[in-house]
Amino acid sequence: MFLLGVIVAIIALDQWSKWAIRTSLDLHNKKIIIENFLEFYHIENPGMAFGLSFPGGSQLLLIMTVLLTVFILGMLWKERNSHPLMRYGLSLIFSGAIGNLTDRIIFGKVTDFIHVMIGEHFSWYIFNVADSSVTIGMVLFLLYSIFVENKIKKTKTDND
């Protein structure tokens, strides 16, 4: 039940933050939060992560996103009693997927606005709360795969 609350909270924060940007900052405008480190820069991304275009166009991207989201939901259900790293990782990935899928369904593109840089020499891609959720979820999933799953496999092998 706690994970459901986490999922709902992340989706709500993602959608609220995108709404706040769309209603307070014109497209391609920015608001500096911390000089040379963090700004909100309003862009709309019709493609995939990092501004990459999808070879099959926006309709195919939408279909693929729906299918992947359903797959993640299935994994989350299957792993509902597994290790917390797995459950939290999948929950964060699912939350981010739903957040960006909502944008694609309603607007046909995703609102991105968080821009991190280090001085004038390093600038990261512009992203949103949903992207952050997916990234953190992937890190947790990888930590599970590297440390926990390998330990479980080793224990099973030692017991056989």
Feature names for model-found ranges:
Residues 1-160:
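Alpha-helical transmembrane bundles and membrane-interface segments of multipass inner-membrane proteins
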